[in-house]
Amino acid sequence: VSGTHGKTSTTSMLSHILIEAKKDPTISVGGMLPLIGGNLKIGKEEFFLTEACEYTNSFLELSPNVEVILNIEADHLDFFKDLDDIRKSFKKFIAKLDDNGILIINEKISNKEELLDGFSGKVYSFGLGKGYVNAKNINYDFEGKAEFDLYVEDKFTGKIKLSVYGEHNILNALAAIATGMALDISLEDIKRGLEGYGGVHRRFEIKGTVKGLTVIDDYAHHPGEIEATIEAAKKLKYKRLCVVFQPHTYSRTKALLEDFARVLSKADLVVLADIYAAREKDTLGVSSKDIETLINKKSQKAYYFPTFDEIESFVLSKLDKGDICITMGAGDIYKLGEDILGI
């Protein structure tokens, strides 16, 4: 399961589907999945389900029979030169499939024909309103969870009810459905598997409430992920939406600075923590204050603080009953949410 984002959620959905279908797969997933009590399960059958990350071209070390490509966006620009370079890597990934290979691909990926040039295996597309497998008539319940009509080859095949939030998870579910169908798993098993999937650690994880303030944690650290998470939160009932964002790596922050400012501006209040360096050193002259400055050029809603203690004090002083606070990022920002809740 590959793509710039959505890998962990889609792999987790597929885990539920395969296990519901009485398969005994080996599973390697990039988050804590309650179904298997962790992120790794050793199975006894032929299926090996894993995430495939493009960073450093590591997914080219795999020899898959089935590939899922969820999306292709600019990321890991400390390794790739640009989006074209990333697309070349995904084209090489598709070339790893032989003539009997199966490719599941998002119909919205641009210039798919170029990526698929030379591939002679089976292709199943998925999307919203378009694709071999697609969703129509999408509705959200009072909790923000989606229900939609599933169409396969333009034929209505039933309603799908998800237990997770947001349009991005509809797309993840469609990818999982298409993969399940390609593996000859019954639609009933696919439906039951999806209905049993309640999410994975640090993916729109509702941590709790304090004095009526709901605290959610999410791993989003790319503009596309951030936008999807904010849009999912907007389906919930709330007064104000606050995002506490910890950028991840200097190279990503520098390369996508304006995109970060644009998507974060969709929240009512934005609080910025220092950049989480991860594998990098501060050599690019970029900081979280740069995001704050860009946001505040258009609307005075962003605040930068250098410590978690200052952020916690600010959040608790600004937010009230009925508000939502999302801690967001791939670093240790989740600890802040736990501090706010007193966990």
What residue ranges belong to the model's regions?
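Helix-to-beta-strand junctions that scaffold the AdoMet/dcAdoMet cofactor pocket
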Residues: L97-D98, K237-Y238, D320
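A glycine-rich beta-strand to alpha-helix segment
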Residues: E310-L341
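C-terminal helical cap/extension that packs against the catalytic core
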Residues: G144, A261-K321
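Structural beta-sheet core signal
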Residues: I27, E67, I105, V243-F245, ...
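Nucleotide phosphate-binding/pyrophosphate-handling subdomain across enzymes
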Residues: E143-G144, F148, V152-L269
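Phosphate-binding loop of NTP-binding sites
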Residues: V1-E107, N111-K122, L174, G180-M181
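Beta-strand->loop->alpha-helix junctions that form or flank phosphate-binding loops
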Residues: S28-G31, S120-F142, K161-E167, K191-E195, ...
